[in-house]
């Protein structure tokens, strides 16, 4: 079998070329992916918290991974309900968190690695939430570098982003690129595994659990539709004009600089140039010119997604 790096590189290339995946489920039989997944989970100490069955990663071995692979090979693997706990938020309220069993966490991390490798090259450059090498700081850098001359800012907060995800829509979106019914069934079963609260079983009719390793990448795949809508519909529809007309104040100071230069008054020209540096060259109120900017990001500490639109 190919090693994990080769498998993920092939998926990245297919994603970059927007080619469909037809045998993604077979990659779940690759032991090297489980070794990589176990290392990723082990590096995140919070991810080692046991789920409802009390299982931990301490007893992880190639033999145990082999048993998981055999169960997946014959579609006998059964995902367990997540253990629901509550953690405090800054507001004083409690946020529900789903803790999957350790085996489910391992399988979930392998699925996450495969999905991230394939979909990451296809995501919008305006998306900064739950992505490698991206976050709030890269979103702010984009705003600082690109959004000059902005007059209005509109901020939107998609509350309960993970909890409101529609399972059927999610699977349909995946099915557009992933032509592998076994893989899609596994994702559907993962979404519908339910949770235990006070040892009572509850169904999950919508959403993916906060605390699940696959939840961030699934939410990005889901919300990529919103990003593409903003890029292909909203931004072209709102865009008007090629360049702003010159700011009257900027033009006035520029004319004064020219006059001072003609009169040989270097000190006045130098002072006027310094003054002009604080004046926008373009007229921000030009009605024949407008642009719409869009960025989406997420708070890694509080799993919620935010949108910024500038005009």
Cite the ranges covered by each PLM segment.
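Non-catalytic terminal/accessory segments
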Residues: 1-311
């Amino acid at each position: 079998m190919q090693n994990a790096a080769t498998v993920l590189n092939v998926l990245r290339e297919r994603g970059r070329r927007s080619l469909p995946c037809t045998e993604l489920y077979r990659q779940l039989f690759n032991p090297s992916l489980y070794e990589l997944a176990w290392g990723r989970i082990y590096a995140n100490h919070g991810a080692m918290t046991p789920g409802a069955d009390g299982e931990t990663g301490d007893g992880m071995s190639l033999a145990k991974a082999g048993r998981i692979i055999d169960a997946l090979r014959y579609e006998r693997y059964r995902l367990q309900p997540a253990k629901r706990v509550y953690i405090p938020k800054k507001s004083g309220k409690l946020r529900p968190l789903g803790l999957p069993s350790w085996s489910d966490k391992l399988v979930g991390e392998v699925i996450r690695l495969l999905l991230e490798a394939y979909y990451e090259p296809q995501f919008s450059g305006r998306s900064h939430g739950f992505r490698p090498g991206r976050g709030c700081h890269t979103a702010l850098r984009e705003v600082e570098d690109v959004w000059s001359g902005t007059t209005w800012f509109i901020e939107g907060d998609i509350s309960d982003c993970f909890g409101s995800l529609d399972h059927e829509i999610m699977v349909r979106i995946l099915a557009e690129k992933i032509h592998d019914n076994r893989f899609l069934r596994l994702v559907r079963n993962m979404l519908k595994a339910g949770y235990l609260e006070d040892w009572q079983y509850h169904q999950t009719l919508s959403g993916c659990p906060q605390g699940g390793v696959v939840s961030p990448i699934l939410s990005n795949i889901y919300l990529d539709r919103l990003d593409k809508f903003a890029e292909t519909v909203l931004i072209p529809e709102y865009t008007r004009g090629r360049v702003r007309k010159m700011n009257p104040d900027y033009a006035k100071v520029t004319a004064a600089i020219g006059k001072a230069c003609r009169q040989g008054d270097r000190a006045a020209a130098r002072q006027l140039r310094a003054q002009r540096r604080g004046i926008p060259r373009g007229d921000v109120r030009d009605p024949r010119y407008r642009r719409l900017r869009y960025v989406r990001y997420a708070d890694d500490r509080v799993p919620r997604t935010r949108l910024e639109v500038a005009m």
